[in-house]
Amino acid sequence: WLMGHMVNAVKQIPTFLNDGANAIEADITFKGAVPTYSYHGTPCDFGRDCIRWEYFDVFLQTLRDYTTPGNSKYYEKFILFVLDLKTGSLNNNEVRKAGENVAKGLLKNYWNDGNSGGRAYVVLSLPDIAHYEFIRTFKEVLKAEGHEDLLDKVGYDLSGPYLPSLPSLDSVHEAFKKAGVDGHVWLSDGLTNWAPLGDMARLKEIVKRRDSENGFISKVYYWSVDRYSTTRTALDVGVDGIMTNFPYVIIDVLNENGYKDKYRLATYDDNPWETFKK
């Protein structure tokens, strides 16, 4: 899964897809518990415009256009998007309400109330394992609206907080249990592209847990990968996905000897909730 990073303006969507991405990531900012914009703000990755944005509802409607067969904007290879939900400043009550609002927003503006909406898979990424109530409420809303089937298209990522230190993987697992999530788990690790590359110790730990007999992780992705050398290192560690500002870099590496026989871009027929067994 090759994810275009920080794709927050609708005009950026075809640019990243044409550069080779089969998925995108967008940053969803809130006013209180209301998802309002796809917007990152400053600071952000080096070399990027941090202030590109769109209204949340319009952004989802545009994603629907690009992922609905028969639509003039349809891209067959666009199969997944990650919503990086900026819930860090919300209290517990707001987190629950935010889960409700995001569920209703996706249902109306992306899934078209279950009537021939967009077909892409969705990963909901939350910055704090304490925000598991967001996921519980999200799921409850879709069930109450009669669209529990759409949960087949939804995965979850709980990846923080980052300060004072990242939570242990056991703590992350417990949060998923509290959220009522068994499967459909994506877990990420990474650094902004202007930070020095570390030893990827946590990434290796996540991959090891994914591959263990009692692993709770479906897929592992790494961000922000913009260098050829970092791409090769991440692939060697065994990631399932890479998030990048420059999709063509990853495409180039995937076509190199040593990688083209081991890796390929995911297609719609590949199950993003199924752990790949070597």
Swiss-Prot record:
Bound cofactor: record note: Binds 1 Mg(2+) ion per subunit.
Tissue: Expressed by the venom gland.
MF annotations from Gene Ontology: lyase activity; metal ion binding; phosphoric diester hydrolase activity; toxin activity
InterPro entries: PLC-like_Pdiesterase_TIM-brl
Keywords noted in UniProt: Cytolysis, Dermonecrotic toxin, Disulfide bond, Hemolysis, Lipid degradation, Lipid metabolism, Lyase, Magnesium, Metal-binding, Secreted, Toxin
Active site as annotated: H5, H40
Catalytic activity: an N-(acyl)-sphingosylphosphocholine = an N-(acyl)-sphingosyl-1,3-cyclic phosphate + choline; an N-(acyl)-sphingosylphosphoethanolamine = an N-(acyl)-sphingosyl-1,3-cyclic phosphate + ethanolamine; a 1-acyl-sn-glycero-3-phosphocholine = a 1-acyl-sn-glycero-2,3-cyclic phosphate + choline; a 1-acyl-sn-glycero-3-phosphoethanolamine = a 1-acyl-sn-glycero-2,3-cyclic phosphate + ethanolamine
GO BP field: killing of cells of another organism; lipid catabolic process
Residue sites binding Mg(2+) per the record: E25, D27, D84
Keyword Magnesium listed: yes
EC number(s) from the headed UniProt entry: 4.6.1.-
Location of this chain's protein in the cell: Secreted
Magnesium among keywords: yes
Disulfide bridges in this chain: C44-C50
CC terms in the record's Gene Ontology section: extracellular region
Cofactor names: Mg(2+)
Main localisation: secreted
Cited function: Dermonecrotic toxins cleave the phosphodiester linkage between the phosphate and headgroup of certain phospholipids (sphingolipid and lysolipid substrates), forming an alcohol (often choline) and a cyclic phosphate. This toxin acts on sphingomyelin (SM). It may also act on ceramide phosphoethanolamine (CPE), lysophosphatidylcholine (LPC) and lysophosphatidylethanolamine (LPE), but not on lysophosphatidylserine (LPS), and lysophosphatidylglycerol (LPG). It acts by transphosphatidylation, releasing exclusively cyclic phosphate products as second products.
Sequence similarity: Belongs to the arthropod phospholipase D family. Class I subfamily.
Protein name: Dermonecrotic toxin LlSicTox-alphaIII3ii
